[in-house]
Amino acid sequence: MSDTIFAPASIPNLREVVFEKIREAIMTGVIPAGSKLSEIDLSRQFDVSRTPVREAIRQLVETGLVHLTTRRGAYVLLPTAKDTLDLYEIRTALEFISVEHLCANPPRDILLQLRGEFDEVSNDWDANRFMTMDVDFHTTLSKHANNSYLDFMLERVGAILQICRHYAIGNIPKVSSSREHIAIIDAILSRDVGRAREKMREHLENTRDALLEYISRHPEVAIPKE
């Protein structure tokens, strides 16, 4: 696992520090989906006692990133087909609200900057960079939708989906995916709510289907890892 992520925690609020470090490891795939979280191992890796690790795991359970069972203990959420369908159903509804708000008052300079970045990555593909850009894209849209509750809910759903998307990235068409983002941006800049919703739906459905395809071809993803 990454030496940087598991660098010793020295900030006073150890529980929050450990929480952020474990969350980062989960979100970036350093701790794979389905992995069991051992308090002993994590406390050794972070060079802290088991108490802040235990508290951090409880906080991760509250976010939905980690499941806690009596028999197996704590483990990272598994990207099952049912999880994927349910989460994308919720996310689509929330993203529709986001683009509706943005069409009413589009942050033009920010959207044009995002557009240029996606245009650039379509010509020079980098999977890791693209994943970061996609997260930043949806985060930027939600933050400028002028609804803090919407932003909070999208962040929560997006964090869970981020675990799954590491598996889907190889199934996403490179150029077409960048064009999907550009099409959404153009619709918002034109204040065309109907088209913005349509393009957002297409984008989310394509990402969802890429993940579902991977899960169907790799059922071992849903096998818990001890």
Question: Where are the predicted features?
Answer:
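Amphipathic C-terminal alpha-helical segment
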Residues: Q162-N171, N206-R217
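Short linear motifs at protein or domain termini
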Residues: M1-E100, A104, E213-E226
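Active-site loop of classical SDR/Rossmann-like NAD(P)-dependent oxidoreductases
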Residues: P173-V175
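Conserved amphipathic alpha-helical segments that form helical-bundle/coiled-coil interaction surfaces
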Residues: R91, I97, A104-H166, S177-A187, ...
